Amino acid sequence: MSFYNHKEIEPKWQEFWAKNHTFKTGTDAEKPNFYALDMFPYPSGAGLHVGHPEGYTATDILSRYKRAQGYNVLHPMGWDAFGLPAEQYAMDTGNDPADFTAENIANFKRQINALGFSYDWDREVNTTDPNYYKWTQWIFTKLYEKGLAYEAEVPVNWVEELGTAIANEEVLPDGTSERGGYPVVRKPMRQWMLKITAYAERLLNDLEEVDWPESIKDMQRNWIGKSTGANVTFKIKDTDKDFTVFTTRPDTLFGATYAVLAPEHDLVDSITSAEQAEAVAEYKRQASLKSDLARTDLATDKTGVWTGAYAINPVNGKEIPIWIADYVLASYGTGAIMAVPAHDERDWEFAKQFGLDIIPVLEGGNVEEAPYTEDGAHINSDFLDGLNKEEAIAKMVAWLEENGVGQEKISYRLRDWLFSRQRYWGEPIPIIHWEDGTSTAVPENELPLVLPKTSDIKPSGTGESPLANLTDWLEVVREDGVKGRRETNTMPQWAGSSWYYLRYIDPHNDEKLADEDLLKAWLPVDIYIGGAEHAVLHLLYARFWHKFLYDLGVVPTKEPFQKLFNQGMILGTSYRDSRGALVATDKVEKRDGSFFHMETGEELEQAPAKMSKSLKNVVNPDDVVEQFGADTLRVYEMFMGPLDASIAWSEEGLEGSRKFLDRVYRLLTTKELVAENSGALDKVYNETVKTVTEHIEDLKFNTAIAQLMIFVNAANKEDKLYVDYAKGFVQLIAPFAPHLAEELWQGLANTGQSISYVAWPTYDESKLVESEVEIVVQIKGKVKARLTVAKDLAPAELEKVALADEKVQAEIAGQTVVKVISVPNKLVNIVVK
């Protein structure tokens, strides 16, 4: 029996594509352009897992489809290769992170090529290549020139075990680091910051212009966190000092019964009374050990200490105590809040815990029992009494401005981006600090500032990066004899990934980041597919840099990615015992359809779970390609379910996809192909072209494959196959199973050319309609025959056809036909006696 011999066919076509540069990006000015982008991977030592190809296959299907539709297609791949794991490996083994990275890239590339993706490898980029990061550094120098890159003494999330500070986004809810799970402490350090806040409003508004999942847009909106309210100034009793709070509800100011400052607030030490000094100092120390996430966790008990000082509520002159509490962050808002415990859950809990006043200023609820957080008419609020929320806010803001104690203010949750890392394996920041106190950017003609090779890459221990140990590189002298020291911090991994999609457009340009005309031709990216875990950070950072480059006149569009799609997660299988503990797959055996612990014999429950090394349930694509073939893996991952759903990996599903490809191979290599169309497959073929085309456009790959299966089933029922339909079908399956399609195409067309650029099939609308229908013939109410007749046949004609049928004649022999009821396109009912 003939079958698809993947071990022979797949390497053959991969070699053909590489040799012929089949997927070189088209540059025909007459054709439209299509840019399909994958989130490029970090080349880890573990290599690809089966989750990677899901997104890659989706963009590959679109790329192959668009080439066949006559587009120039840009479909590139590269490597996000700076980052902590390579550095950690180098520290553990004494090897150079560059060598480790190069080996990993070679392995990733081998695996990717084995899956038949149609990348244009002439455009490969690597963020650790000096010819690439020259332009990462160039962008930084431009940010610096425009005042958007600046140094500040900021409390950072310091991870002792990693020897570096990490961004807020890299701290887990339990207060440990995302990488390694190490404790995170807050400590002030000199850091480079990027002023992403200058773009907050545009980052928010321009989300309206892109075709992204609403859930991702919402995550970005929440991260930017725009709120309109007022800044209110509180004077501190018996001093000339004051502080400002931002509130979205200035109308509740009459209910403010205490104020809270962040433990790090500048005023804390100077306003604390002698009696409270010790308690305040100890509380500040404890707060410094917690991450922002741990501090703001709503589920934890509130803690705080009174400073001994009082503020004056500007609206009624009342003295209110000033506390410090770690749920107020110095980095958020003004680092100070006014507390209205009657109408805010956190303030209410705090007030109850420490016996502070609770004064209701909105009607409704019993604030002794619980805070009232709904809207209501104002009470206990002097000139606001009886007003609703909108009226009261407007009136209070006017009062604050009139009395010089506040003004309307728009605030954002978004903070400036902490851009420095105290590590070796990253882009050097191209800044020199001179002994006269000035700093300058490295001039453009001296870029790239190359990362020096060194075997000593342990953190310096001083909070500086290992580059601080490299004196020859570190120390420089200006022409006028002034000595300087290079910046020792390096950029975060996010830097290179914030603009890589631009370099793919013109990867070998030595003169500029990319040519303007080429950027105009290819931007914005038509489709960007990757994991939802990058919803906020990578996408927000890339949008920020893109907008900055737009302002410089470097890029022609306001947004980088027109359409974004997040593929779901491919889950592994996990097993749990009766206590709910997870059992590694190599300790599990299957008996009679159930699963048992090999050592204890206990029956286990099977459930999907994220693939992980510890559970030993990670599936390696190399093994799948070896056993089933790359086309099977591609078809299976697209057929598992909707592209954005998270679905459990299944060996049975893989086998099913393999059987389907074998059936396709058999159909097209053993069925007699004829030049004359019998018309039997007209409807199903045209339906298949229509459905597959529309569903590829809509990224509904699972239902496109289901339609291909319907065609194969229908074609197998016929004795012969019309050759044009055979060719059309092979073209339709080519984006999903390209190796198989190339092989079958040579059998059909025998041109020696790839199927990749053969024009995509079209369908005939008129053939989508049935010209014949099946009707049933009933005698005495029972179905005795099924007949195929012309559609819309008149009742009298229908009756003739039914009565002439042999089966029907045999059934009514010797009986009298009393009446015949004919319903066109449905049935003929014969009444006999």
From Swiss-Prot:
Disulfide bridge partners, by residue number: none
Motif range ('KMSKS' region): 610-614
Matching PROSITE patterns: AA_TRNA_LIGASE_I
Localization terms from the record: Cytoplasm
Pfam families per UniProt: Anticodon_1, tRNA-synt_1, tRNA-synt_1_2, tRNA-synt_1g
Catalyzed chemical reaction(s): tRNA(Leu) + L-leucine + ATP = L-leucyl-tRNA(Leu) + AMP + diphosphate
Keyword Disulfide bond found: no
Keyword annotations: Aminoacyl-tRNA synthetase, ATP-binding, Cytoplasm, Ligase, Nucleotide-binding, Protein biosynthesis
Gene Ontology biological process terms, A to Z: leucyl-tRNA aminoacylation
A Gene Ontology cellular-component term: cytosol
InterPro entries per record: aa-tRNA-synth_I_CS, aa-tRNA-synth_Ia, Leu-tRNA-ligase, Leu_tRNA-synth_edit, M/V/L/I-tRNA-synth_anticd-bd, Methionyl/Leucyl_tRNA_Synth, Rossmann-like_a/b/a_fold, tRNAsynth_Ia_anticodon-bd
Keyword Transmembrane applies: no
Domain of life: Bacteria
GO molecular function: aminoacyl-tRNA deacylase activity; ATP binding; leucine-tRNA ligase activity
E.C. number(s) listed in UniProt: 6.1.1.4
Similarity-based family: Belongs to the class-I aminoacyl-tRNA synthetase family.
Protein name (Swiss-Prot/TrEMBL): Leucine--tRNA ligase
Organism from which the protein derives: Streptococcus suis (strain 05ZYH33)
